[in-house]
A protein has these predicted regions:
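HotDog/MaoC-like acyl-thioester-processing domains
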Residues: 29, 61, 92-98, 102-135
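A conserved, well-ordered hydrophobic junction motif at loop->secondary-structure transitions
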Residues: 33-67
């Protein structure tokens, strides 16, 4: 796919997505390999804040991909709320996280998503997130 920095506004050291894997319908997928130098890593594990930021950037990459494909400027997005965040285990350095973002509802500039993070097909985290796009 495209260079991830072409799809999201974040820059190092806060980039929390390595690759946008594409989308079909309302579901998109992204990838992050947890590295030791990640600012959200402590004691060789990725924090809850890191997972939430990864989820938000995964949703942003979908928006970026759609807007870029239409040759339109990519809007900034902001987390409005995070609900029902659940984590069964913290990703460790070296883990390869695949995240699925499903669009639940889009109304004007507000999008409600459901996110699920996997390591080797094991679901390790999930949440719902409300995102506001700046128009």
């Amino acid at each position: 796919m495209d260079n991830i920095l072409d799809l999201i506004p974040q820059r190092a050291p806060i980039v929390m997505i390595d690759e946008f894997l594409g989308f079909k319908g309302e579901i998109s997928r992204s990838r992050l390999v947890v590295r030791e130098d990640n600012i959200f890593v402590d004691d060789n594990t990725l924090s809850e804040c890191g997972l939430i930021e990864h989820i938000a950037q995964s949703a942003a990459a979908r928006v970026g991909y759609i807007f870029k494909s239409k040759d339109m400027p990519i809007p900034l997005g902001f987390i409005g709320s995070v609900n029902n965040f659940a984590i069964s285990r913290h990703p460790a350095v070296g883990d390869d996280i695949i995240t699925e973002i499903e669009i639940i509802q889009e109304v004007l500039s507000i999008t409600l998503i459901e996110a699920r993070c996997f390591i080797n097909d094991e679901e390790i985290a999930s949440c719902r997130m409300k995102i506001f796009l700046q128009q």
